[in-house]
């Protein structure tokens, strides 16, 4: 049975990390994807992923026409080709560590139409050093025996809310609702603003979605994914 999910991965020439990301996904979430879209920010050949992901029904392997085009333009290009109601967004440097994150995330999005996306990182990973607290609220919520936590509301200069390009399930309809991720940036900073600043894109869209009454959720404190690309950052 189809879950109506397309996985979109942004990749930037780190094929060893991409392979590890996909192997761990296939281990913990087989038979959950209708399609895998990988948008590569350069000329690399990613056809090897078809052997890593045998349960995926369809592959769409894109290569940016310009090397180092930037994450946001590539995301919007990939999203324009999504045909399913849900997107599991991911980057090329994560390791999934536990099962059922797709099913649990999907359940939360189905139950709560105002939930924008579901975080999978540990609560410790989402720590704000400047405030000595996590982005995740302390109160545990339970729905149908599934525990979840809400991400703190966005406050200017305080972070929180949680819209992110980190791994997480979200709806294609919510992306279209705001006219794409670049639209809030253009409204605030002008159409010619440098859209390669991923953190600014996340913050601006966080504020924008919160004004629409949406919130983000997180699964259990120990998390179900870990970042493996800390020392392999690609500058924009």
Provide a role label for each language-model segment.
Residues 1-23:
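N-proximal low-complexity "stem/linker" segments adjacent to membrane-targeting elements
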Residues 20, 160-236:
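C-terminal catalytic/acceptor-binding lobe
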Residues 23-33:
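Short, acidic, metal-binding catalytic loop of nucleotide-sugar glycosyltransferases
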Residues 38-49:
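A conserved acidic beta->alpha catalytic loop
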Residues 65-81:
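Glycine-rich, basic loop-to-helix element that forms the pyrophosphate-binding segment
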Residues 87:
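Short aromatic/hydrophobic "clamp" motif used to bind/position activated sugar donors
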Residues 99-120:
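Conserved donor-nucleotide/metal-binding helix-loop-beta segment in metal-dependent transferases, i.e.
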Residues 116-134:
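Short beta-strand-to-loop element that shapes/binds the nucleotide-sugar donor at the catalytic cleft/hinge
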């Amino acid at each position: 049975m189809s879950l109506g999910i397309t996985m979109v991965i942004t990749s930037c020439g780190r094929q060893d990390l991409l392979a590890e990301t996909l192997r761990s996904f296939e281990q913990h979430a087989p038979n959950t994807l209708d399609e895998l879209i990988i948008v590569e920010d350069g000329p690399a050949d990613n056809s090897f992923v078809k052997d890593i992901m045998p349960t995926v029904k369809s592959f769409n392997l894109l290569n940016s026409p310009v090397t180092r085009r930037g994450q946001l333009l590539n995301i919007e290009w990939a999203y324009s080709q999504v045909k399913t109601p849900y997107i599991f967004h991911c980057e090329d440097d994560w390791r999934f560590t536990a099962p059922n994150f797709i099913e649990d995330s999907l359940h939360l999005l189905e139950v709560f139409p105002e939930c924008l996306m579901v975080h999978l990182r540990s609560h410790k990973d989402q720590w704000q050093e400047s405030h000595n607290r996590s982005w995740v609220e302390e109160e545990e919520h339970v729905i149908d025996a599934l525990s979840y936590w809400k991400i703190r509301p966005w406050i200017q200069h305080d972070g929180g809310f949680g819209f992110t390009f980190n791994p997480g399930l979200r709806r294609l309809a919510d992306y279209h609702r705001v006219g794409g991720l670049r639209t809030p940036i253009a409204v605030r900073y002008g159409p010619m603003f440098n859209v390669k600043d991923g953190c600014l894109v996340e913050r601006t869209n966080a504020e924008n979605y919160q004004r629409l009454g949406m919130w983000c959720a997180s699964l259990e404190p120990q998390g179900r994914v870990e970042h493996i690309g800390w020392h392999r950052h690609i500058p924009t």
